[in-house]
Amino acid sequence: MIKRVFAIFTLTLLFIFVRPVFSLDTSSKTLEKYTKKISNKFTRTYCNTTKFGISYEGALAFAIGETNKEFKNNKLNKLIDDSLLKNSIINDLENNCQVYDFDISNLENLKFN
């Protein structure tokens, strides 16, 4: 008798306090858009900072800091491909800022975890 009352009480509490779990939309299109958004943010920040006359090292540190700050709390950070992101940044720098000698190893501090 006590076992049944305890079981009913426990099941009632479980059904009352259980929250639904929603899946995270992680389609490849969503990840590509997110990667492009990060790449565009970094590129804009880096280009604008160098145009203001700040040194390349200072512009790099500022762009990495601003990009990390803006995107650090997004749930998609665990799912993005770092090499794809870095290559996208390099391509955007070449196409938008005409920076052709940017080394990919400069982006090692661009981390969101």
Residue positions per predicted region:
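Classical Sec-dependent N-terminal signal peptides that target proteins to the secretory pathway
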Residues: M1-L24
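Alpha-helical interaction segments
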Residues: V5, T12, K36, N87-S88
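Acidic/proline-rich low-complexity IDRs
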Residues: T10-L13, S23, T30, A59, ...
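Processing junctions and N-termini across compartments
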Residues: F17, N40-K41, I90-N91
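Short N-proximal segments of mature Sec-exported proteins
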Residues: L24-K75
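Compact alpha-helical subdomains of small soluble proteins
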Residues: E57-N113
